[in-house]
């Protein structure tokens, strides 16, 4: 089973942060910000592949191998372990998309597909 996540577009996150900094709307709150839909890692890879015109597939790796790879990239073990726990939990307990993003941004949140289109050049 793949992890299900609701990735948030950085423009939506930035808009929510600006609102939080410039108003009192979010004082004493801790909103959970998400993108508008749940997607699997395989779906993410497929969308990136479609955008760049090359097939990309998601390949599941053993958590210890993933940890070793992250360590080789200079990622601290505490961060690597946190990421691995996040994705493991997202398999059985995905964080559902929240409407708070629309409320904070003032418009519907951007989809993962839109994020991919906005970042296509980054994948080439």
Set out the residue ranges of the language-model regions.
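Rossmann-fold dinucleotide-binding core
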Residues: 1-7
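Mid/C-terminal beta-alpha module of Rossmann-like enzyme folds, strongest
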Residues: 11-82, 93-124
């Amino acid at each position: 089973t793949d992890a299900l996540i609701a990735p948030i577009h950085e423009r939506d996150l930035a808009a929510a942060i600006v609102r939080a900094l410039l108003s009192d709307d979010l004082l004493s709150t801790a909103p959970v910000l998400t993108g508008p839909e749940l997607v699997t890692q395989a779906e993410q890879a497929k969308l990136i592949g479609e955008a760049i015109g090359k097939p990309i597939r998601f390949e599941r790796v053993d958590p210890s191998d993933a940890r070793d790879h992250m360590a080789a990239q200079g990622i601290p073990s505490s961060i690597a372990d946190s990421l691995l726990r996040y994705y493991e939990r997202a398999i059985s307990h995905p964080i559902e998309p929240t409407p708070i993003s629309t409320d904070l941004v003032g418009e519907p949140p951007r989809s993962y597909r839109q994020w991919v289109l906005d970042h296509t050049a980054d994948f080439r």
